[in-house]
Amino acid sequence: MTAARAGALGSVLCVLTGASRGFGRTLAHELCPRVLPGSTLLLVSRTEEALKGLAEELGHEFPGVRVRWAAADLSTTEGVSATVRAARELQAGTAHRLLIINNAGSIGDVSKMFVDFSAPEEVTEYMKFNVSSPLCLTASLLKTFPRRPDLQRLVVNVSSLAALQPYKSWVLYCSGKAARDMMFRVLAEEEDDVRVLSYAPGPLDTDMHEVACTQTADPELRRAIMDRKEKGNMVDIRVSANKMLDLLEADAYKSGDHIDFYD
């Protein structure tokens, strides 16, 4: 983080899902220095204690940023509604940017192959959290903070190479990520004032990666994932978070584009 970038994103109202750990937690820390004092960050996750702790950390380190949190299960209608209510109570105020970061997501059951998924309920539950939730949350937030001349609206979908490339035993994860990418491409086509970015952060050393290492059913893929970690070929999570924020600052991407860390 250089001095030249401090406050570069301006006055922002940001809603960040999946904020309590992993990439979301890192994004929260890296975003705060890039916004102007008086900006607001709404942290969303299922885990109340982790959110409280993160909010306290950020409040101490960045006293000029107003940090709020909402503990919500985004796989439910109630959780989405609670998040929208929390955002509405903040109001946009003097913010010149609305930034919605859809980071919450899960890898699903990677211990099974395609032919093992015979229960529709399991697939439906996965898609509720990973596809339906970001669609309904983003739609509701865009309605809550409608188009106005002095407000730039940005939507980020935290994506994956799995949105573009099939991986054996990752049928839920690949399908969910592909659906999300297309969903947000449609948003970019429909709303010409909304800047939309699907960003794939690369292989990160997170809890999700640990699940992939230990539970992936396909032995070749599992070995490749483990080898990458053992050889130190993971992406630094802070570097990836800052690349995403650099992309938002530069604002040079085509709305709806999928951009990978390695691009």
Swiss-Prot record:
CDD domains: SPR-like_SDR_c. One of its GO terms (biological process) is tetrahydrobiopterin biosynthetic process. Disulfide bonds: none annotated. Its main location: cytoplasm. NCBIfam families: sepiapter_red. Belongs to the sepiapterin reductase family. Homodimer. This is Sepiapterin reductase. It comes from Xenopus laevis. The lineage of its organism: Eukaryota, Metazoa, Chordata, Craniata, Vertebrata. The gene is spr.
